[in-house]
Amino acid sequence: MKSRDEIISLLRRYKPTAQEKYGISKLGIFGSVARGEQTPDSEIDVCYEGLAPSFLTLDMIQSELEQLLGSKVDLVRVRDNMNSLLRQRILRDGIYV
């Protein structure tokens, strides 16, 4: 697994593409990678803000991120009406690029 700094750097480079292609306004990581507690088997938790994509588009974004980061990605859209515990974790641990 790549380091937290490598993941952040890769996401920074990907963000302009995500903004243009998918309407993503904010992109970041949260969870074990953001806290520096990841293991070789950890998924990379990626959060984003922006337009709500279709399931097909969401799958495309996830595939692009998994290829870019070389790991399984769990992709979560941050919004007001989401699970409050998950939202709190993202707000607490999240690192936006």
Residue ranges: model-predicted function:
Residues 1-26, 34-40, 50-97:
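Catalytic core of pol beta-like nucleotidyltransferases
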Residues 29:
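Conserved histidines in hydrophobic membrane contexts and catalytic metal-binding motifs
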Residues 45-48:
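Short beta-strand->loop micro-motif that forms the acidic, two-metal-ion catalytic signature
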